[in-house]
Amino acid sequence: MKLVFAGTPEVAVPALDALIASDRHEVAAVVTRPDAPAGRGRRLVASPVAERAQEAGIEVLKPAKPRDEEFLARLREIAPDCCPVVAYGALLPKVALDVPARGWVNLHFSLLPAWRGAAPVQHAVMAGDEVTGASTFLIEEGLDSGPVYGVLTEEVRPTDTSGDLLTRLAFAGAGLLAATMDGIEDGTLHAVPQPHEGVTLAPKITVEDAQVQWSAPALRVDRVVRGCTPAPGAWTVFRGERLKLIQATPVLDRTDLAPGELSAAKNNVYVGTGSHAVELLWVQPQGKKPMRGADWARGVRIAHGELLGP
């Protein structure tokens, strides 16, 4: 089939590579978000998908909005059979959805109808899901509500960050998306409506959402830290400045600390929660590089009974 691929971040690149490598499909063009400022100099930088497409000699379309007439005219001119999508980053209007003969097919990183929305992997980790996965589905005007073509499952490991899990799903999902394109072309794959039961939502995790509440149980603190790593980054406040929490682990035999209370030993630093303590393994003070929690604690000389939090 003739395809127009839509995607933007690094997580979409494995799927694009899988479709480029396919001997059954032609990636005629790529749609991605416009170049965005990055780095200290705030220089405009092309998206990872745009860079990969340019390396492969594929036409790149960067509409400010996917309803722009110039973009729609070019899309109609290309006349794709199908438009596979991975983390494009903009809602597609009906006028765009109607262009490809076989629609737009999204690779979504959850087992739909669970975790519909922008941050399914982060929410799966934060909720303590033991299994998640990826789904390919036909995009409709609703939020991730279209009929499903295929799914795969992936174990959520006890130490997974959302970044770890998303990386595995990106590579596994690339094969699922390519197989979905094959099945659509063959006419052997038919989308099945999502059940009405089991719908959960996964809105974008904000910086405010990522603030650790020390009154929560240790298990919840651990999940928030892992779910918000690498982005937006779990955090707390120490002496009026933000402290990023990169890695923490529950310590089941410490129940002597009040929520937010710090306790430093020679090679460890602990903080109390609503249940057990957690050990801060890696942190990043404001304006500094990541460091081991014990090294940070030695440097700041924690006072007896000193607290983390607002």
From Swiss-Prot:
GO MF annotations in UniProt: methionyl-tRNA formyltransferase activity
The record lists the organism as Streptomyces griseus subsp. griseus (strain JCM 4626 / CBS 651.72 / NBRC 13350 / KCC S-0626 / ISP 5235)
What highest taxon heads this organism's lineage?
Answer: Bacteria
Disulfide bond listed as a keyword: no
| Enzyme class, UniProt record, top EC level | transferase
Listed under GO cellular component are:
cytosol
Organism lineage:
Bacteria, Bacillati, Actinomycetota, Actinomycetes, Kitasatosporales
- InterPro entries per UniProt: Fmt (IPR005794), Formyl_trans_C (IPR005793), Formyl_transf_N (IPR002376), Formyl_transf_N_sf (IPR036477), Formyl_transferase-like_C_sf (IPR011034), Met-tRNA-FMT_C (IPR044135), Met-tRNA-FMT_N (IPR041711)
Q: Where in this chain does the entry annotate a coiled-coil region? A: none
Q: Any idea which UniProt keywords this protein has? A: Protein biosynthesis, Transferase
Q: What name does the UniProt record give this protein?
A: Methionyl-tRNA formyltransferase
Identify its protein family. Answer: Belongs to the Fmt family.
Magnesium as UniProt keyword: no
Q: Any idea what job this protein has?
A: Attaches a formyl group to the free amino group of methionyl-tRNA(fMet). The formyl group appears to play a dual role in the initiator identity of N-formylmethionyl-tRNA by promoting its recognition by IF2 and preventing the misappropriation of this tRNA by the elongation apparatus.
Pfam family name, one: Formyl_trans_C
- Entry-linked NCBIfam families: fmt
